[in-house]
Amino acid sequence: MTRIKRGYIARKRRKKILAFASGFRGAHSKLFRTADQQKIRALVSAHRDRSKRKRDLRRLWITRINAAARNNGVSYNKFIRYLYKRQLLSNRRILAQIAVLDKNCFSTIINNIIE
């Protein structure tokens, strides 16, 4: 059986990984083995944090809606319950944007729902 040295294919693979790690600090961008490990770690973190971002943004929207609702004398819990009761549940992201950008519109929404 003949020996396979993998010449340019191995070089191409290493260059690709080092190019991915080019923005990393210190040896993590210079040495292949550490760059390879850091690439795996970076991709794991990116995958985990894509799910975490969804959770964090939902918490932020709920906090903003709660703050705006309490300024109008209603808790978040009651506000959402009335929205469900009237079958008007809108997107929490949209409600949070309305609460932040247009306070008068949000207060009219609350007044119309809670009657």
Curated annotation (Swiss-Prot):
Residues annotated as signal peptide: none
Family in the record: Belongs to the bacterial ribosomal protein bL20 family.
Major subcellular location class: plastid
Membrane-spanning residues: none
GO biological process, one term: translation
GO molecular function: rRNA binding; structural constituent of ribosome
Function (record text): Binds directly to 23S ribosomal RNA and is necessary for the in vitro assembly process of the 50S ribosomal subunit. It is not involved in the protein synthesizing functions of that subunit.
Location within or outside the cell: Plastid, Chloroplast
Keywords: Chloroplast, Plastid, Ribonucleoprotein, Ribosomal protein, RNA-binding, rRNA-binding
Pfam families cross-referenced by the UniProt entry: Ribosomal_L20
PROSITE patterns reported for this sequence: RIBOSOMAL_L20
InterPro entries: Ribosomal_bL20, RIBOSOMAL_L20_CS, Ribosomal_protein_bL20_C
GO cellular component: chloroplast; ribonucleoprotein complex; ribosome
UniProt-recorded name of the protein: Large ribosomal subunit protein bL20c
HAMAP family: Ribosomal_bL20
